[in-house]
Amino acid sequence: MTNLIEQSIDKIESWLAKKGFALLKSKLPTIQDEVDFERKVVFLSLRSKPECQLYSLLHECGHVVIRTRKDYSIRFAASVEREENPSKNETNRSIVEQIEEEILAWREGQALANKLDIYVNDGKYYKYGFRWVMSYITLGAIGKEHYLPIAFQQEETNTKKQITKEELTRLLDNAHETCYNQVIANPLDKDQ
């Protein structure tokens, strides 16, 4: 399986090169899965399981697909404005656009896997993606000053420490009870 994943990552790296992007893979703790659009570099952390690396890389490529479309600056205008002026406060629109882009990036990653004939276990791919999307939803709901992003990364080492239920309840006291109980409280346990 690992050899198949390595071959898949090589296919994606070739696809990125055709798009004018380089792939930088590293085990350094400072490297996170992300795209630097100014330098045209996709960063891939090698600290997670190979299957998760593949899924993360497909997701980051989804961002490349989305952001290189001609209509990106129109469709995601608030996000573009926020990136150009980081001191500007986030708006509801920029938060929603960020979440929308994250969801679309997972879908575009899946489409790229199909295009490149890369095997992806759909259930695992979307479960992994849902976990990260929930992190952005939580971030948007509670604000950056209360967010613990490392909590979502530590799951792979069986440390499931996240924001406590009490902290989240206090911060989201206006959240609908059903939404909180079924989605926010247990994002890793639900395939929603």
Q: Where are the model-predicted features located?
A:
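Intrinsically disordered, low-complexity, basic-enriched segments
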Residues: 26, 30-35
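Post-HEXXH active-site segment of zinc metalloproteases
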Residues: 67-103, 126
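An active-site-proximal "capping" alpha-helix that borders the catalytic cofactor pocket
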Residues: 98-115
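Pan-zinc metallopeptidase signature
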Residues: 80-84, 88-89, 112-192
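Basic/hydrophobic alpha-helical interface regions
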Residues: 2-21
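Active-site recognition of the HExxH zinc-binding catalytic motif
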Residues: 55-69
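Alpha-helix boundary/N-cap detector
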Residues: 3-7, 100, 124, 163
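Short pre-active-site segment immediately N-terminal to the catalytic Zn-binding motif
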Residues: 41-56
